[in-house]
């Protein structure tokens, strides 16, 4: 009998059953759909209602000011606001995919509202054409809209996220003065087009055009397979005739047309074949048309809702009140003044169980449970009959339970599945548990207080993540949290949204008390971003609360920037240095640098070693003057001196400061300033003396360049200066440098010997060697000659070397093996020198002969 009562509610359309269960008795009062513009969101979303200003209606006790009211699907008021926007009449209103209410008025201005009836700034516009010509019609899809102006222009916004209006190409006949012929619009959504961009279908009279972003095409349809003589054919050859209304199927593959002669024509958009051609009793265009899933089309006239299928007679539903058709992916919700129904095709699993006279395995299993509850042996008989198909029967019961809105029927079907599962060893046990979890979630959100009547197919398409997002946007945080916990999903999004909403809703709650409330919930989720909540608190003007919240943020990368934004520079510097992240420290340093006076800034970083060192490292490269101020403020005079000294070197490297230029004067002054600063500290006596010597040398070099007119002296060393003077023949200047800087005789001999060898002035070198006995002997002369590759000149000085080892090595270097061997034999080093020479002169037997006595001794 239960099967009979369930199936009795069904309607048969050809070979497919449809059902129309009541979902809600509407909770609202004094709402007449015929007097209002209504926008219903898909997936069981909210309903927006506003009095239709294009109709003359009796106000009764209502205010003359219109109110925009937002209800849930059960008719419970969520929010309302007074509509007082300029721009003319409200032309169109629809919900976007993210549940933003889009309202377009006559002059093309777009007003956006959230679910709480709060206006989202800024207001947008459909463009200048809409403003000048006025909007007469709007067609919305999930994330876009196309508007028709009085001048026949099509203006489209393809994505509400960008809000960029685009003018579509002109449609033939649409911009003509005679617009008395029927015009209708519909949209094929981007996800169903080849280009990935929405296509606007425009019917002008008996022509249908596909309008894309940059082109317009005319559609021609092929003849159907039925008797051609019954088809209407106008003079232009169009088989369909004048179109008065049209809609696109949910999958974008079919186009439904209602013609001037009362025919419903369904066309395949890909093949251009007419799939259905049905003549209605009335030629009046329906007020509404909608697809019911993919199997039938609904047409609504006053008091009559007709459902047409591919074959067979239509099904009629009669209403004594106005209704709104709300298409869904698996059916149509029917909203009236008093209730909300859901018209859908009966799922195959449900049909197999409850169809009158059904003997399917699932029906027998459901019947077996009934016998089992009545302690009848018939239960065992039914199980034996379906033993081979028991898994299939269990699966059908589970699937049917998922499609039910009635909780009692859900339980009965799941009990039948569990009963059959006990006798089915190879069935996946998790399947029942998964369906139970899904149904618990669906039943929770279907509660009238929540008012989201999702079917299981809609729930899977929407996904739990989006459902939770919609719950928290509706401030149903507790339910969202419980669902997140139940489905093992991340709770952070829910708790964070609740915390932000709590701060917004508690302007008079003391910061300390509100902090306790927030922490009590925020601590439920590990790793939650306290910084994000603190940012919201700061945006709400609760800076103290923001500072208290950010103290609990464990991630320095989020904590420090927020501390800076709320003016807590001291705390930010502490947290940044404690983290050891140099990027964060630099962020704080630059922020404070810009915000605070220099002395205050210096005092802040002086006590923080890492911050101070990083600042000094940066300033050394880019901000010398500022760094000098810092060192002076901290008493580090010697550091200022080093900076001055470095500046003098940098000035010398300046390509604009050519040698011998007047810039050497400023350089010397900088060095002298550095010397004066060094002299003020006992620890830097050496640096003071070095700076003094540097300045003195720079002056002499500048004078030399001026006298020789050769820019080759400045920035060279004392040795190089002396050597250059000798090379140039300026012996007097070389002696002056030697005397001025107290160059030792030993170094003088080395420098002069090599300088004379460089210019190959061998006579002068020989004369120099004979002036007086060299303090280091004749080795500098030997080295200079060998270095100049002058063996003959070297032989003048090698015999004068007193050290046998040095003499032998000198002979060896110029290739005189015998003389080198003689010196090595006379040297008192145990044959070590001979051994070295033997390795140097591989083919020379002299060293082997001389080494024999030493080898015998060893």
Swiss-Prot record:
SUPFAM superfamilies assigned: WD40 repeat-like (SSF50978)
Tissues of expression: Expressed in roots, leaves, stems, siliques, flowers and mature pollen.
Membrane topology, as annotated: Peripheral membrane protein
Places the protein is found: Vacuole membrane; Prevacuolar compartment membrane
Keywords on record: Membrane, Vacuole
GO terms of biological process kind: intracellular protein transport; negative regulation of embryonic development; vacuole organization; vesicle fusion with vacuole
UniProt keyword annotation of Membrane present: yes
GO cellular component terms, semicolon-separated: CORVET complex; endoplasmic reticulum; HOPS complex; plant-type vacuole membrane; protein-containing complex
Mutant lacking the gene: phenotype: Absence of vacuoles in the embryo and accumulation of small vesicles and autophagosomes. Embryo lethality at late torpedo stage.
Major site of localization recorded for this protein: membrane
Domain of life of the source: Eukaryota
One Pfam family recorded for the sequence: Vps16_C
Record text on subunit structure and interactions: Core component of at least two putative endosomal tethering complexes, the homotypic fusion and vacuole protein sorting (HOPS) complex and the class C core vacuole/endosome tethering (CORVET) complex. Their common core is composed of the class C Vps proteins VPS11, VCL1, VPS18 and VPS33, which in HOPS further associates with VPS39 and VPS41 and in CORVET with VPS3.
Sequence similarity: Belongs to the VPS16 family.
Purpose: Required for vacuole biogenesis and vacuole enlargment in dividing and expanding cells. Involved in the docking or fusion of prevacuolar vesicles. Important for the function of both male and female gametophytes, but is not essential for the germination and development of pollen.
Protein name (Swiss-Prot/TrEMBL): Protein VACUOLELESS1
Organism lineage: Eukaryota, Viridiplantae, Streptophyta, Embryophyta, Tracheophyta
